[in-house]
Structures are given as C-alpha cells and as structure tokens.
Amino acid sequence: MGNKYFHKILLDGNLCLANKRGYVYMSNELKTPFRYDYVGSFLRPQALKDAKAQLRKNEISKEDYDKIVDEEVAKLVAKQKELGYHVITDGEFRRAFWHLDFMWGFEGVEHENTGGGIQFHGELALLDDTYLVGKLKAKPHPFVEYFKFLKQFEDENTVAKYTIPAPAQTFQQFIIPDNLESTRKFYETNEELIHDIANAYREVIKQFYDAGCRNLQFDDCTWGAVVGDAAKLRYKALGIDLDTVKSQLLEVNNLALEGKPEDLVITSHICRGNYNSTYFSSGAYDSVADYVFARENVNALLLEYDERSGSFEALAKVSPDKKVVLGLITTKSPKLEDKEAVIARIKEASKYVPLERLCLSPQCGFASCEIGNKLTEEEQWAKLRLVKEIAEEVWG
C-alpha cells in the first residue's frame, strides 16, 4: 500500500494512508477478522504458572507477579507477530477463567471458590461460584487497564483485540438454577436483569473505546448450550421454554450493542465449552441460526466447526453484513489436520457464504481457563502455522 506519495500510519487503531500534506485516508486493512485469525486465549507459559503458584503461597508480592505477567504478555505478542498474525491479544494471561473474571469487574457481583463447577464431558470444570449481591452496574473496569497495556504493542501491521464474555453469558450466569434465588432478591424479572446488563456493557464498551480499542470480541457459549437434544431435555425438565431463552439471549446482546461507534468492530465467538480439552455440549447450529446468525448485530461470527457442530447448511441464515470465521482447526488435540481436508470444508462452506466473507481460525482458544488444553506450546504454534498456511493457499 505504501509508496512515494503515501505512507502508512496507525490512527485510533486503524491503518491509514497519509500524504505529505497530512491528509489521511482510511484503510480497512486492519479491520478484524483477518483471513487467518484466532480466538484469543493461549496456553500459560511455565514461568507464569510458577509465578501464580508462588503468589498463592505468598512467596512473591502481587506487584512482582504483575511484572511477570507483563513480561509474558510481551513475549506472547512478539510470538504472534513472528508467526505473521495481524491481531494481537494478551492470551487472557491475567484471568483464571475466560468469562467469570470479567463479571467480577461489575458492581453488585461477588464470587467464592467452593470447590464446585460445571459438568463437562467426562470432567468437572472447577469454577468459582459467581452471583449477585446487589444491582449490577458498571464501574471503571480492570480489563480496560489490561487492554491499555496490550495496545502499546500495536504497530502498522497489527491491531489489538480484546475478548470479553458476551452479555448473554453474563445474563445466563445469573439465571442458572443455583443463582436464581439470589438474583430474584434484586431482579423480579429477567427483563429487568437484561436491562441492567445491557446498560453496564454499553458503559464498559465505551471505556474500551475511549482507551483506543477498535476490536472487541464477545465470547459466547450460551448459543452452544441451547442446541441439540440434550438442551431440549434439560430446559423441559426445568419447565423453561427454549424459544423464550433464545429470544432473551438475542435481546441482551443486541441491547448492549446499541449505539456502538461505527469504527468499533465487535465480533462474537460461539462454541460449546472448552476446558482441559473437553466440552460442555454438542449439536448443530440450525436451531439458533434464525436468532444469532440472522439477527445478532455483530460484525462477524467466529464459529466452532468441529465434529460436534453439524453441517454448514445453517450458514445460509447468516445476514449479508457479517463475515464468518470458520473454526476448523481444533485446539483440543495436538494432531494437525489434513490441509486438503480443511480446504475442502472451506469450499463446502462457501456454498452458503461467499468465499470473500469467509476466514479461518482454530475452533476455540488454547486455554479458556488457567488449566489449558492438552497440547504443548510448540504444538499450539504449529496449529497457528497451519491456519496461516491454509488461508494463504485459499485466499492468496
């Protein structure tokens, strides 16, 4: 793009061309998602695991621990750039859980480690109990400060992306059976809760925007949790209408997106759970496509598409204003996919969404929680090399 008449500059997180007189021309070159992309979380390096263990034993101070985290994030970003990726993240290194830590940053939310969790396929995912102790409101969010640290590493070839749980994920957290009694002390109806969650998210989104964030990703397991026969049986046993649930998930997400700045890209990653290489649910997207694919007001969808995800036919419901990132490379196993088989799947998906609106990524993050998935760091990088290699062959 650059030549003797123009030079590249980074303005508010967007790559631009500027001439010698200072006139600026906007470019979409650094608008996520990219042809080869990734979800966001990475395996915690051993130095970080050791530091966390020392912190828990009071062998190092919180200040010393934070310095180590900063160093490891800087190393991760350097690796992301070395691999040729245009998006940088902090790997979620500052979190214990991909979703709960963000919720703890709202007023009215408390958490406690009671040794409980959520049953995944063959394994209990140990999670902190997270519940309401008052009305949910926004306050200066610590994740915004984490983003500011990441943003300093942006350059003319990269843009910082930050991942947070979707509003629907926060809504779902406070209406699960174990939390409903405490939630009803502050919210008589789900609609009241939806209203406050959407307001809080809009405020936090503004905080991110004011800090220079132009690429924000909602991570959303709620849609994956309401697909398949098991979900139908689960909600029927609870006496809850599944279509009402889907409508409320869509409502809270779209309310939170109202009024977002035009130059802020917000995407949504949808999967079915990711903990120590296990999963929470299985099922095709068909039963939620009319909601999230057709009517959720995000710029792009990063969709898990492994063997538990059904066919590509549901992609026909994706609205024409959205891009789709196909999550065809698993992060749950170190085995590398066959390149030609992945290319064939991309070709199959292009029957429903034009190739120019498709991208490629791993199906989920590499470490949605501190424990991480069952592969090594080098196997993690090999997955990303494969994604890039395939994308360059398909799209040039």
Task: Identify the residue ranges that each predicted region occupies.
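Domain-level signal for soluble alpha/beta catalytic cores
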Residues: 22-396
